[in-house]
């Protein structure tokens, strides 16, 4: 059995940033396990620009952004293994050296099935797309139906054109970006349909990818039928009511040979379940504290495996913090101060969830960033933060939408001033 201080599952932007951060915090035995044939994760197929504005103060493409972290990881001498699939993470038994290390079981063509003992594991597996099977779309199963991410890989990496007449269901960021990409490659994007009464993507992507190319966006619409047996020949859209049920008489037929699905992303947590990590039913990601540590001591999570982010810059920021906290865990032997007060964070009044879910004042830095999403579109409302009955923040926002992540920064000095604090509440209040 091999022994490492930190094993990072995933070599995408989160895993790379976490590894570099841990190395800079004086941890030498670090291993990245990546199932793909190269580091970089999803960024390798995101050849559009818009990355790095926060992290590097300049606009980069996805491969350029990933390349900077890959270069840093290699310069720091961090070990990584490609084409390696992690099968299981065990946290219950003692390892060969008598410690309560985590046992990571993985496999690849070179080493076969092998086991690694790690003092700390960082989960950075990213997320996956919601497939057609989860959408209950009626009709046959002809060729020409792709997830937006699959089409993106076919066009940008493999060099294949999925189709010439395209309809896109879902207005997530990948779907919006692929509407522009397919148009630039010569395809005709007939329409982008969205089930909800608001877009699931960033406002800037709606403007740059749809408005600039005169691609129509139909809100509160969904696919009710797919025509074609061997290949998609067309799809039927219908408007939906407030219960997301199709409204009879609103059907519209669009001739097309390709249907792209951009209907949400799901954090990839099958491996997390093997480690008995508690998952948040709203985000489908791990429940973490202020140190990004899960309910399993020594297991940390960051990036899209934790919750789906808008910007990769925020992923890198979060992963850097996870790497630093994991390094502190290793150096302290897992011991923590019991002097602090653990405060739970409650999402209510229009806020769907928060990350983290708890804050321990002894473990937190001088500030703690809490990220969250709202459940509907709000205009001219306030983000209100309360510590029990005491108001800490009351900040006005002109517009908030589910497609854009929000955040508040909590001050440690405000939290420790209160005697026996119990709950931080974050909610939306009307102006």
Placement of each model-derived feature along the sequence:
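FAD-binding core/adjacent interface of flavoenzyme oxidoreductases
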Residues: 1-9, 66-165, 241-249, 260, ...
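Beta1-alpha1 glycine-rich phosphate/pyrophosphate-binding loop at the start
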Residues: 4-68, 72, 76, 153, ...
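A Rossmann-like FAD-binding core segment of flavoenzymes
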Residues: 73-106, 183-270, 366-399
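Predominantly flavin-linked oxidoreductase catalytic cores and closely associated redox partners
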Residues: 114, 120-217, 224-227, 231, ...
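FAD-site-proximal beta/loop scaffold in flavoenzymes
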Residues: 123, 145-155, 258-309
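Mid-to-C-terminal Rossmann-like scaffold of FAD/NAD(P)H-dependent oxidoreductases
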Residues: 313, 321, 325-395
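Short, aromatic- and glycine-rich surface loops/edge beta-strands on solvent-exposed regions
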Residues: 383, 413-431
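Exposed aromatic-hydrophobic patches
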Residues: 403-415
């Amino acid at each position: 059995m091999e022994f490492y201080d930190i094993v990072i599952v995933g070599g995408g932007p989160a895993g790379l940033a976490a590894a570099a951060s841990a190395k800079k915090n004086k941890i030498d035995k670090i291993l990245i396990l990546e199932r793909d044939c190269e580091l970089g994760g999803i960024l390798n197929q995101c050849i559009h620009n818009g990355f790095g504005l926060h992290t590097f103060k300049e606009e980069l493409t996805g491969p350029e952004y990933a390349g900077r972290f890959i270069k840093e990881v290699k310069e720091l001498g961090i070990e990584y293994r490609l084409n390696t699939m992690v099968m299981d993470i065990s946290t219950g038994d003692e390892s060969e050296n008598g410690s309560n290390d985590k046992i990571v079981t993985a496999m690849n063509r070179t080493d076969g099935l092998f086991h690694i003992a790690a003092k700390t594991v960082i989960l950075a597996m990213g997320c996956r797309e919601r497939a057609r099977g989860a959408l209950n779309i009626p009709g046959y199963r002809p060729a020409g139906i792709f997830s937006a991410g699959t089409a993106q890989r076919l066009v940008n990496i493999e060099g294949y054109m999925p189709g010439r007449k395209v309809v896109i269901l879902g207005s997530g960021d990948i779907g919006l970006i692929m509407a522009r990409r397919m148009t630039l490659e010569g395809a005709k994007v007939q329409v982008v349909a969205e089930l909800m009464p608001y877009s699931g993507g960033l406002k800037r992507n709606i403007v740059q990818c749809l408005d600039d190319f005169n691609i129509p966006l139909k809100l509160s619409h969904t696919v009710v039928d797919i025509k074609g047996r061997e290949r998609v020949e067309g799809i039927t859209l219908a408007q939906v009511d407030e219960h997301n049920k199709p409204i009879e008489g609103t059907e519209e037929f669009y001739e097309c040979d390709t249907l792209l699905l951009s209907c949400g992303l799901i954090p990839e947590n099958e491996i997390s379940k093997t480690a008995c990590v508690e998952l948040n039913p709203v985000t489908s990601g791990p429940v973490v504290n202020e140190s990004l540590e899960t309910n399993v001591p020594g297991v940390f999570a960051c990036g899209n495996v934790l919750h789906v982010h808008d910007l990769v810059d925020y992923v890198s920021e979060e992963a850097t913090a996870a790497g630093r906290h994991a390094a502190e865990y290793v150096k302290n032997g897992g011991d923590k101060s019991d002097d602090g007060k653990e405060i739970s964070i409650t999402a209510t009044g229009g806020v769907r969830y928060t990350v983290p879910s708890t804050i321990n004042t002894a473990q937190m830095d001088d500030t703690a960033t809490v990220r969250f999403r709202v459940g509907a579109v709000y205009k001219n409302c306030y983000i209100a933060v309360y510590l029990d009955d005491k108001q800490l923040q009351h900040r006005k926002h002109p517009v908030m939408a589910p497609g854009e992540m929000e955040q508040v920064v909590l001050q440690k000095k405000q939290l420790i001033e209160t005697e026996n604090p119990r709950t931080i509440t974050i909610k939306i209040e009307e102006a």
